[in-house]
Amino acid sequence: MIIRGKQLVALLLFIILPTCILAQSKRQQNNDKELLAKAIDYYQGTKYHEALLFFEQLNSIYVLNPRFKAYMAVCYYHDNDFKKTTETLDTLLQSLTVFAPREQAVYYFINAESHFQEQNYKQALTNFEQGLPLSDNKEKGYIYYRIGFCHLFNEEWQLALNAFELSIKSYNDNNLPNIHEQQTLNMILGCQEKLKPTTEITPDTLPQTPKSEGSKQSQSDTEEKKEK
């Protein structure tokens, strides 16, 4: 069988091309492994913006696992991109329950804080409360402080008062400095003021306007005429 020129080229491509693609694929995989290693290294070194650039690059190629997506959310949070933080974690938190409680607490907190900054106080409250039992005692004073404001902005005065009082107690119980103490005390007073019962003013309790001497005399004259 005689192999003509075009057939020979096609045959060579058939043999060589898969090998080239495989080699290129391996090089790409090695490059991506290096990118991931750099991303993790930057993340652990708290260089969140730099880490995020690598994570986003990898996320455009692969489906990242939940932990790396959670790392991305932390990076978004430290970049003050609260919208992307919540977009990432809202759908992810339920799949993070296999992680250690302390790690889960971090993700609940940054999602709650991001919702708070976005003025979505209802969802912020939910995440603060979910993360509270997973958090270290030293962190609970601030979380109660934030919970108090969530209730405050929803005009839930009694719940806000309870949370602010728990915040003060938590800081005191753990002997921690409380930079929010004065503001918390002010909020407690404000809630107590809102909870004071309002006194209804009825007609019987209204102050009576004293009659003038002229009107008294006029009334007396009228009564005398009636008697006559």
Which residues are covered by each model-predicted region?
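Terminal, low-structured helical/coil segments at or just beyond the last alpha-helical repeat
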Residues: 161, 166-228
